[in-house]
């Protein structure tokens, strides 16, 4: 299965999780989204149309996907065949993120997972079900 890991990280938490996913999925492709806040644009986005599955990793912002991931989905959501979502956060917001993804892709995720910041700091999480 050809997999693309797409991630955005402002503080490094989502980047850490994406790195673990990439290491576990030896041979997958990855794309780090670079966000220009002033222009509200992203760079570094790869077209997901040639991939069987996309794993998206990003922080939750205000009970929703981070703006860079929303921009990615606005541009490429229709090209995503199958996807999983992993979000990092301080608390709540997974259901809002899933709604964002379903709206952009027209599909339910294969899986969705929230990793709280305290779990991340303690390395107390298991991403294997998302792989």
What do the PLM-derived regions correspond to, one by one?
Residues 28-32, 108-115:
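Short beta-strand elements in bilobed, periplasmic/extracellular small-molecule ligand-binding domains
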Residues 1-75, 124-131:
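N-terminal beta1-alpha1-beta2 submodule of the flavodoxin-like/Rossmannoid cofactor-binding fold
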Residues 110-131:
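Glycine-rich phosphate/pyrophosphate-binding loop and the adjoining helix
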Residues 96-106:
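Short, aromatic/basic amphipathic alpha-helical patches
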Residues 13, 61, 90-93, 119:
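Glycine-/small-residue-rich active-site loops that bind phosphorylated ligands and cofactors
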Residues 21, 25-26, 79, 104-108:
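Short, structured coil segments at secondary-structure junctions
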Residues 63-93:
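Mid-chain, well-packed structural core segment of small domains
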């Amino acid at each position: 299965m050809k997999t693309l890991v797409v991630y955005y990280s402002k503080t490094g938490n989502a980047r850490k999780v994406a790195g673990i996913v990439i290491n576990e999925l030896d041979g997958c492709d990855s794309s780090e989204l670079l966000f220009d806040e002033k222009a509200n644009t992203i760079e570094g986005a790869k077209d997901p149309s040639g991939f069987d599955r996309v794993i998206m990793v990003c922080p939750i912002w205000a009970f929703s996907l981070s703006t860079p991931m929303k921009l990615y989905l606005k541009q490429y959501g229709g090209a995503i065949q199958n996807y999983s979502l992993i979000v990092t956060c301080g608390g709540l917001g997974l259901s809002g993120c899933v709604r964002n993804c379903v709206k952009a892709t027209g599909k339910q995720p294969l899986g969705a997972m929230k990793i709280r910041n305290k779990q991340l700091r303690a390395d107390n999480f298991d991403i294997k079900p998302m792989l």
